[in-house]
C-alpha cells in the first residue's frame, strides 16, 4: 500500500518514485489538502518542516547498515529514519532528512508512538485498550453493537499500531466505515506494517486491506466506501483463509475467469437477511473447503486444508538458559548455549527450510546437498555464537582424487539470492555437519554444498560424489473416485510433510496452490544429472493411473539446478461403489531404462460416510413416555452374525496308503497309519518343501489334529463318511482352535492393529462379546465416558492387551484371542489383512541379516536396489546395526507383496516357497509359517460351516 495518497493526475507533473504506491483518486473528497499534495523531496521532509505529510512513520535503527548499491540508504544504529512506503515487504522506502533510499525492514523498529518527535506524523496519541473500544468510539458498528461479544479482546502491547483487515466473518468482518468529523487534535492512522511480523506477511497483503487514513481535522464530510456501513463482521489479523481470498478475488476489478478457484465462491454478507443465515452459509462453504480430491475440479469437489503450512518451519523463544530448536520431521537443529543472551532477555529463533535453492548454488562446480535454511533472530545483543547441526545427503567418492577435488562447505548469506560466502568453522563427521554461526544477523541463509576445485568442463562435481535425492509421493487427506497424486523429487533428504502444488491445468497465475500430504518417500543415489522417468502403478485393477505405466519425465537440467520437480498423476476409480484404500508402487528409471528406486505406499482411506439426517420435524420423548417404550422382539441391535459351533459337513474323506512316522517332529505335518481314514477339508493342494524336495499336500483332519498330508499318500473316496472313521468329530469350534495354533508365534505392531480395528469394527459391544466380555458394561474397559464408537473399540482392545500381558491370570495369547474374536463375528477380510501383516513382519524379523538372499529368491532384486532399501536405516557413519536389519527386510517384503496382488494365499504361499529355496532354510527351525498357510487356506471352510448363508427372516424390521 502507498505511503501517501494523491490524485491520479499529478498537478506538478513531476516524476514519482514507484515505491510511493498506486495512485488513488480522491476526487469525491471536498478537502483541498488532499488534492494539493506535492512530490516528496528531502527538504520537504525535514522534521521542522510544517508541510510534512501525515503518513510519514518514524523508526529507529537497531543495527548499522552499509549499502552495496546506490538505491539503498546508509544509516547507523540509533539513527532516526522516516518511512514513506512499506509495500516492499523486506525493503522499505525512507529518508534521513538528507537523502532517500531503501532500507531493510529487519534493521529498524518503529519508535514508541508516545515519544514521537513528529507532531503531525499520524501516530496514535492514545492507543485504545481494545479493538472494541475503538469501534465504539468511532461508531463503526452501527446497529450490530448488540450482537457482538462484550468480552475484551487481547491487548496489543507489542504492536503500537492497530491493523484491521478482512478476516473470519464469524467473529467480526471486513470493515471500511464512513468517517464522520473527528475532534481537533485526535488523529487516527492505522498503519499497515507490524514491526514484529515476519517479512512474508507484508508481501502477501492485498489491495483490499482496510486503511483508515488520516483526514484533516476540519473535515466534515463523509467518505464513500464500497463496503456497507452496517457490516457486522470485524476482526484484526494478518492472514487470509481460502474463503476470504475468494471474496477478495470476486470483488476485484478484473476477476479471473476460468481460474483454479472459479467454482469456489465464498458467500457475501449482503446476500443474507440476518447474521445467522450468513453464519450457516459460511460454515457450509468452509466445510466444502477441506479435502480436495481433484485438483482440476476444485469448484465441483473442493476441500483442501487452507491452514496448512507452506514450508517446514518452526519459531521458538528461548531465555538465557539456552536450549535447542529442531525443525520438525528433519535432522536439522540449532543449539543455543547457556547465557547466549543476558539474564531476563529472550531470543526468538525462526527456522525454515526453503525447497528451491538459488540458481548460483547449482552448476558444474557446485551442488547443494541440504535445503537452504532461513534463520531469523529477534535479539542481536548476544554473548555467544549459535551451533547449527544438520545431515547432508552426499558422500564423497572413495578414490583419492575425489577427496582432493571436492569438498563439503557451508555457505552463508544475508539474502536468499546471495551472494553466499563460505563459513570457516565447520565440523564434519560422517554425514552429520556442525556449523558455528558467529557475527549473527537478523536474517541469515545457510546451505551446505559440495564444491569442486579445479574442475574443468566437461567434467562436473557430480563425477566425484554420490549424491542422494528423495522422491516423495503426495496426495489428498482422503482418496475419492477421482483424485490426483503428485510425485516430487528433492535434491536433499528433507521432504516436507505438506507440499504446495499449483501447476495444474490452465489456472490463473494468481491462484493459490493446493496443499497435499506426504504419503511416503524414499532416498536413492543419483549417479549424475540425467533424464529420469517416474512411473506410478496401482496394485488394484479397479484404479487406473493415467500415464502411470509410461511414466513422466524429469529433465536432467532440473535435477542439476536442484529445483523441486512435481509430476501430477490423475487416478480414477473404475467402480466408485467399491472405493477403498489401495497400494501405489513408485518406480524411478534412469535414461537407459534401469530401475534406480522403487517402493510401495498405502493410500489413505476414503472419507467416512455420514448418514443422511432426517429433514422432518424432530419429536422428543417426554420423561413419562420413556418407560412405556417396548422394543420389538424382531429388532436387531448388532449387524454381526453369530458364530455357531456345529459339525463341519463339507469334508471329503480318503484312505491312507502309507504309514508315516517323522523323525523330526513338525506340529503341522500329520503322522498316520496305512489303511486309516482321514478327513480332507478340500481337494485344493498346497506346495511346500518336504524332506528333500517340493511336494503337494492336502489339509487333513486325523485323530483330532489338523495338519498336512502328502497328496500321494491319500486315495480320495468321496464325501460319504466311512463307518470306521475314528477320532472326535470335527466341529467349527475345534476347527477354529486347531487353525489358530500358529498365531501366538507371530509378531505384530500394536499401533497398526489398533488403527485397523478402529477403522473396521463398528460395534464395541459385539467385539467385547466375541472376546468373552459378555454383559460387562463400558465402564469396565474405560474410566471415562467415551462418545465415539471407535474409541470404545480401542478401549476394549486395550483391555485385552492388558489381560494377556498380566502375570496373575492364565496366560493368553493376544494374537490368538484377537483373531478368534474377529472370526467369530465374521470379519474375515480384516483377519486376512492382519495375518498378512503379521507374517511379513515376523518373516522380516526371522530372516534379519539374510534378507538379501531371500530378496534374490523372491524377486531377483539387484544389489543397487538392496542398498536403496537399507539406505534410510543406516546411522550417521553409514553402518546398519544387526538388530535393525529387519527394517529393510520389512520394507522389501511390503514392496514385494504389493506386486503379487490382492491374494493373501498367493503371498504366503510364494513367501514359503522362497524361504524353502534359501540355503539352510529358516523354515526348518521356524515351522509356524506352515501353520499360517494352513490357517489362510481353511478360512473359507470355517466360514461356510459356522455362519448361515441366508439371513433369518426376522432380522428385517
Curated annotation (Swiss-Prot):
Residues 54-113, 649-719 form the SH3 domain. InterPro entries: DEATH_SH3BP4 (IPR056183), SH3-like_dom_sf (IPR036028), SH3_domain (IPR001452), SH3BP4_C (IPR056181), SH3BP4_SH3 (IPR035456), UPA_SH3BP4 (IPR056182), ZU5_dom (IPR000906). Gene3D superfamilies: 2.60.220.30, SH3 Domains (2.30.30.40). GO terms for molecular function: GDP-dissociation inhibitor activity. Keywords: Coated pit, Cytoplasmic vesicle, Endocytosis, Membrane, Nucleus, Repeat, SH3 domain. Possible role in regulating endocytosis of the transferrin receptor at the plasma membrane. Alternatively, may function as a negative regulator of the amino acid-induced TOR signaling by inhibiting the formation of active Rag GTPase complexes. Preferentially binds inactive Rag GTPase complexes and prevents their interaction with the mTORC1 complex inhibiting its relocalization to lysosomes and its activation. Thereby, may indirectly regulate cell growth, proliferation and autophagy. Homodimer or homooligomer. This is SH3 domain-binding protein 4. It comes from Xenopus tropicalis (Western clawed frog). The lineage of its organism: Eukaryota, Metazoa, Chordata, Craniata, Vertebrata. The gene is sh3bp4.
Amino acid at each position: 500500500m502507498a505511503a501517501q495518497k494523491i490524485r491520479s493526475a499529478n498537478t506538478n507533473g513531476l516524476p514519482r518514485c514507484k515505491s510511493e504506491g498506486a495512485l488513488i483518486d480522491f476526487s469525491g473528497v471536498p478537502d483541498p489538502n488532499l488534492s494539493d499534495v506535492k512530490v516528496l523531496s528531502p527538504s520537504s521532509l525535514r522534521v521542522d518542516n510544517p508541510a510534512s505529510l501525515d503518513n510519514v512513520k518514524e523508526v529507529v535503527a537497531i543495527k548499522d547498515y552499509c549499502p552495496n548499491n546506490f538505491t539503498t540508504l546508509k544509516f547507523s544504529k540509533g539513527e532516526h529514519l522516516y518511512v514513506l512506503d512499506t509495500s516492499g515487504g523486506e525493503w522499505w522506502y525512507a529518508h534521513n532528512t538528507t537523502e532517500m533510499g531503501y532500507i531493510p525492514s529487519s534493521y529498524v523498529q518503529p519508535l514508541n508512538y508516545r515519544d514521537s518527535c513528529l507532531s503531525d506524523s499520524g501516530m496514535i496519541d492514545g492507543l485504545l485498550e481494545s479493538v472494541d473500544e475503538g469501534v465504539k468510539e468511532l461508531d463503526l458498528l452501527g446497529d450490530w453493537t448488540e450482537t457482538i461479544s462484550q468480552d475484551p479482546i487481547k491487548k496489543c502491547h507489542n504492536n503500537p499500531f492497530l491493523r484491521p483487515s478482512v478476516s473470519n466473518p464469524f467473529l467480526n468482518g471486513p470493515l471500511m466505515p464512513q468517517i464522520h468529523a473527528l475532534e481537533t487534535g485526535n488523529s487516527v492512522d492505522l498503519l499497515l506494517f507490524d514491526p514484529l511480523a515476519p517479512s512474508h506477511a507484508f508481501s502477501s497483503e492485498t489491495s483490499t486491506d482496510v486503511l483508515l487514513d488520516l483526514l484533516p481535522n476540519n473535515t466534515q464530510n463523509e467518505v464513500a466506501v464500497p463496503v456497507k456501513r452496517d457490516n457486522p463482521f470485524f476482526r484484526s489479523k494478518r492472514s487470509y483463509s481460502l474463503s476470504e481470498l475468494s471474496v477478495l478475488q470476486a470483488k476485484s476489478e478484473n476477476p479471473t475467469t476460468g481460474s483454479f478457484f472459479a467454482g469456489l465462491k465464498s458467500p457475501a454478507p449482503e446476500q443474507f437477511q440476518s447474521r445467522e443465515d450468513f453464519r450457516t452459509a459460511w460454515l457450509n462453504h468452509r466445510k466444502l473447503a477441506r479435502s480436495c480430491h481433484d485438483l482440476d475440479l476444485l469448484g465441483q469437489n473442493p476441500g483442501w486444508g487452507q491452514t496448512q503450512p507452506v514450508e517446514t518451519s518452526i519459531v521458538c523463544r528461548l531465555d538465557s538458559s539456552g536450549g535447542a530448536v529442531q525443525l520438525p520431521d528433519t535432522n536439522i537443529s540449532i543449539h543455543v548455549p547457556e547465557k547466549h543472551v543476558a539474564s531476563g532477555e529472550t531470543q526468538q529463533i525462526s527456522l525454515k527450510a526453503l525447497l528451491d535453492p538459488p540458481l548460483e548454488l547449482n552448476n558444474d562446480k557446485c551442488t547443494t546437498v541440504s535445503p537452504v535454511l532461513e534463520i531469523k533472530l529477534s535479539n542481536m545483543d548476544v554473548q555467544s555464537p549459535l551451533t547449527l547441526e544438520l545431515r547432508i545427503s552426499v558422500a564423497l567418492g572413495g578414490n583419492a582424487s575425489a577427496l582432493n577435488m571436492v569438498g563439503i562447505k557451508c555457505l552463508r548469506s544475508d539474502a536468499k539470492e546471495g551472494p553466499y560466502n563460505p563459513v570457516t568453522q565447520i565440523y564434519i563427521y560422517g554425514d552429520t555437519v556442525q556449523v558455528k554461526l558467529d557475527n549473527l544477523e537478523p536474517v541469515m541463509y545457510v546451505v551446505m554444498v559440495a564444491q569442486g576445485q579445479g574442475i574443468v568442463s566437461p567434467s562436473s562435481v557430480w563425477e566425484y560424489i554420490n549424491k542422494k535425492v528423495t522422491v516423495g509421493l503426495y496426495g489428498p487427506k482422503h482418496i475419492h473416485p477421482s483424485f490426483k497424486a503428485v510425485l516430487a523429487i528433492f535434491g536433499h533428504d528433507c521432504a516436507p510433510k505438506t507440499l504446495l502444488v499449483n501447476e495444474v491445468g490452465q489456472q490463473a497465475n494468481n491462484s493459490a496452490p493446493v496443499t497435499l500430504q506426504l504419503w511416503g518417500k524414499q532416498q536413492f543415489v543419483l549417479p549424475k544429472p540425467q533424464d529420469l522417468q517416474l512411473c506410478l502403478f496401482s496394485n488394484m485393477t479397479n484404479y487406473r493411473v493415467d500415464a502411470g505405466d509410461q511414466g513422466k519425465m524429469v529433465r536432467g537440467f532440473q535435477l542439476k539446478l536442484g529445483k523441486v520437480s512435481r509430476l501430477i498423476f490423475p487416478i480414477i476409480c473404475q467402480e466408485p461403489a467399491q472405493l477403498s484404500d489401495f497400494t501405489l508402487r513408485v518406480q524411478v528409471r534412469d535414461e537407459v531404462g534401469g530401475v534406480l528406486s522403487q517402493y510401495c505406499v498405502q493410500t489413505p482411506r476414503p472419507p467416512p460416510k455420514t448418514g443422511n439426517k432426517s429433514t422432518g420435524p424432530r419429536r422428543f420423548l417426554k420423561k413419562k413416555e420413556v418407560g412405556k417404550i417396548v422394543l420389538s422382539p424382531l429388532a436387531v441391535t448388532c449387524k454381526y452374525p453369530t458364530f455357531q459351533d456345529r459339525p463341519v459337513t463339507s469334508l471329503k474323506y480318503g484312505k491312507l496308503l502309507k504309514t508315516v512316522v517323522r523323525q523330526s517332529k513338525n506340529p503341522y505335518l500329520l503322522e498316520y497309519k496305512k489303511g486309516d481314514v482321514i478327513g480332507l477339508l478340500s481337494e485344493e493342494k498346497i506346495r511346500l518343501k518336504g524332506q528333500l524336495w517340493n511336494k503337494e499336500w492336502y489339509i487333513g483332519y486325523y485323530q483330532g489334529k489338523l495338519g498336512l498330508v502328502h497328496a500321494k499318500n491319500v486315495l480320495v473316496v468321496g464325501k460319504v463318511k466311512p463307518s470306521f472313521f475314528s477320532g472326535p468329530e470335527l466341529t467349527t469350534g475345534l476347527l477354529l482352535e486347531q487353525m489358530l495354533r500358529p498365531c501366538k508365534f507371530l509378531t505384530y505392531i500394536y499401533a497398526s492393529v489398533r488403527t485397523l480395528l478402529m477403522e473396521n469394527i463398528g460395534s464395541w459391544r459385539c467385539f467385547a462379546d466375541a472376546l468373552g466380555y459378555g454383559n460387562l458394561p463400558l465402564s469396565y474397559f474405560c474410566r471415562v465416558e467415551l462418545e465415539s464408537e471407535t474409541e470404545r473399540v480401542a478401549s476394549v482392545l486395550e483391555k485385552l492387551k492388558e489381560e494377556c500381558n498380566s502375570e496373575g491370570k492364565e496366560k493368553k495369547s493376544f494374537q490368538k484371542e484377537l483373531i478368534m474374536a474377529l472370526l467369530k463375528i465374521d470379519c474375515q477380510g480384516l483377519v486376512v489383512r492382519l495375518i498378512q501383516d503379521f507374517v511379513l513382519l515376523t518373516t522380516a524379523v526371522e530372516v534379519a541379516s539374510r534378507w538379501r538372499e531371500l530378496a534374490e529368491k523372491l524377486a531377483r532384486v539387484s544389489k543397487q536396489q538392496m542398498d536403496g532399501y537399507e539406505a534410510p536405516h543406516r546411522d550417521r557413519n553409514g553402518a546398519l546395526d544387526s538388530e535393525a536389519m529387519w527394517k529393510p527386510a520389512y520394507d522389501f517384503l511390503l514392496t514385494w507383496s504389493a506386486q503379487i496382488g490382492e491374494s493373501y494365499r498367493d503371498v504366503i504361499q510364494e513367501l514359503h516357497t522362497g524361504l524353502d529355496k534359501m540355503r539352510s532354510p529358516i523354515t526348518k527351525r521356524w515351522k509356524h509359517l506352515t501353520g499360517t498357510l494352513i490357517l489362510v487356506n481353511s478360512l473359507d471352510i470355517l466360514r461356510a460351516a459356522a455362519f448361515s448363508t441366508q439371513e433369518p427372516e426376522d432380522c428385517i424390521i
